[in-house]
């Protein structure tokens, strides 16, 4: 199928933009979207911001009132043994101010971990680090009268501990707290702990993206929270792209068109607050701003690592100070392991992998850049183009649960596609297809998933790549400069 975006009044010739975040799946068990589905339940759900809609189980409520937290001290709100899940968090600070939003921290420990799984200003958990206006999202929110809530499920299997810390120089009054605990049992094999990345404190970095988060292990990112201050108020500060790199790929898998488009708004941050169920922003006109986006239907799964950054201006040419954190469900284990690589610029690597290409083979030198944070670093290599096929042999782990192929190529030409064969058998679940093109930042890394039924129990694979034309003219645009091989090891 395909996706087509059109403006509301395209006959006027007005410009516009948009972004599509998508997941690819095998056909089995997947129903194609038709546009005729009934959305009533979803619409009603999204209208109930501020209400806990996820937790249907019997809840045990742990409530406390009128607690004073002295400067530099902490209080424990929950210390629970056994198995369960936090179903909701609510806090009321009657004397909240902007400084408290940064100085009152929450720490959450699951299963007696030495380091907290959640550790950040409470404002991050509520989705608003500035506090100028109410921002009520579906799963978290903040009101200017001092209320915070968060409804992300937070499973644990042995122990849960929640602490509030006052890092300010004055006492803070916690008027009310409510922690709802469910006895839901989650399977440990495919459930992650609810976590956040180490809080990225407010700072400017020159010439590169602000590195908001770097995660190691396996999981899926479900929310982003970023705050920005420019050198003075009312300066346009919206042009920096969000860029997300997954599993070590040099090409960002998610890249926004400016900062505000990441939370699904346009034309900067001129009219705070702007809120929809899955995201929005607070602040003052243009800056400072504090934005939140939930990645629920479009979560970002990762199997070895995830990096999240944001530009300062159009090309890191502006003085901006960012802070923030990423929320995710994660496990410590890295389940995607590199087992081999084929470098087509190395005669030794070509020979070792028995690589060959057939049919009008052309080798072309390319001096260009990757998209993203390192788009000013020149990378030099050669690409191979051919009309018939290429083939090569790679090593894998016999204990694999599937294999990922990663290709390095020149994306100057649009709509590259190929059929993939493993040991003579075609991978029929999908075509290797990349729609993108960039004539300026031409180096591209993209991935192809090979299901375990083609790879399990094997120590090596014979790969065959057969280009397919996606154009009316029949032009073949496929090319390759390098392959990396990764195994899923659950």
Language model: regions and residue ranges:
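Beta-strand-rich ligand-recognition modules
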Residues: 1, 139-151, 155, 259-301, ...
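Beta-strand-centric surfaces of beta-sandwich/beta-rich domains
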Residues: 1-363, 387, 409
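Periplasmic c-type cytochrome electron-transfer domains
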Residues: 368
